Regions:
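Short, solvent-exposed loop/turn segments at secondary-structure boundaries
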Residues: 60-61, 103, 117, 153-158, ...
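C-terminal substrate-binding subdomain of Rossmann-fold SDR/epimerase-dehydratase oxidoreductases
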Residues: 28, 171-293
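N-terminal Rossmann-like NAD(P)+-binding domain of SDR-like oxidoreductases, especially those catalyzing
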Residues: 1-148, 288
């Protein structure tokens, strides 16, 4: 595993405690030529999950976002090209590339029109992966994820998405802040379902050059999500506040994806209901409070 282990973006060796002795951890950036070249040469599959995911952070530090999410990824692809790597590359993109949905559920044919720097950088990097496949034979595909949550996600700041924020505040007995009426709908993906999808993508011979929208058939409003988190935690509360301008400017409204292609091509199905997933998540953090809160 090659990981820069940046703490504020989820890197934490604690997450690997159960895998000691079964994996090699190399602390390096994704565009480190020597490290990536050697790792790629020894790999049949590369799961490319490197990047920063905060939309708000991408607006506050746009150059940083582009450096992490696009420039370094271009360096990674160049390493694969120069090495003539034959590894299958599964890249994790985001639903944010679509911007405001023109129709729901959103399928792969929906126009790409991001509303923040993170969406732009992730969209550009997805296109680079596909381009390097067409021109140089890099066997890349892209899986567009939405609202991933579950054990071992970083909770200590606001850089990993809305669900970690909700979980942290509920477990700390603090109010969960919902902007506006919280009516925007989302589909949330439990981490185990994401892992299964990535493994299926890596095994499929039909995947290189393809993109997949991956979400959950269960749709919940943000307020309903907050209510489920509070109920599972048995603590916390919910307060509604007006939209801050910086958040309102990049909010996309309701979003839920059409995963028909992933189901048809990969044989993937989301198996975890939000109620079950959030209960497992809350229990994990309650049992490991000192490490994550």
């Amino acid at each position: 595993m090659v990981d820069a282990l940046v703490p504020t973006h989820g890197g934490d060796r604690v997450n690997l405690d159960g895998a000691a002795g079964r994996i090699d951890v190399i602390e390096a950036h994704v565009d480190d030529v020597g490290v990536v070249r050697d790792a790629a040469a020894a790999s049949e599959v590369i799961f490319n999950l490197a990047g920063q995911v905060s939309h708000v952070e991408s607006m506050a530090r746009p150059r940083f976002d582009l450096e992490i999410n696009t420039a370094s990824q271009l360096g990674f692809l160049e390493i694969l090209r120069e090495a003539g790597s034959n590894a299958v590359v599964v890249y994790t993109s985001t639903r944010q590339i679509f911007g405001h949905p023109r129709y729901l559920p959103v399928d792969e044919d929906h126009p790409v029109s991001p509303v923040d720097v993170n969406g732009i950088s992730k969209s550009a990097t997805e296109q680079l992966h596909l381009l390097y496949g067409e021109l140089y034979g890099v066997r890349a595909s892209s899986v567009r994820l939405t609202n991933v949550y579950g054990p071992r996600q970083r909770l200590r700041d606001n850089l990993q998405g809305v669900l970690p924020i909700f979980v942290r505040r509920a477990l700390s007995g603090e109010p969960i802040t919902v902007f506006g009426d919280g009516a925007q709908e989302r589909d949330c993906l439990y981490v185990d379902d994401v892992v299964e999808c990535l493994l299926l993508a890596a095994r499929s011979t039909e995947v290189p050059g393809e993109v997949f929208n991956v979400g959950n058939d269960e749709r919940l409003s943000l307020r309903a999500i907050a209510e489920e988190v509070v109920a599972a935690a048995g603590s916390g509360s919910i307060e509604s506040v007006p939209w801050p301008h910086d958040r309102d400017a990049i909010d996309i409204g309701s979003y839920y994806g059409d995963s028909s292609k992933a189901k048809r091509v990969l044989g993937w199905e989301p198996r975890t209901s939000f109620a079950d997933g959030i209960a497992r998540t809350i229990e994990f953090y309650r049992s490991h409070r000192s490490r994550y809160l």
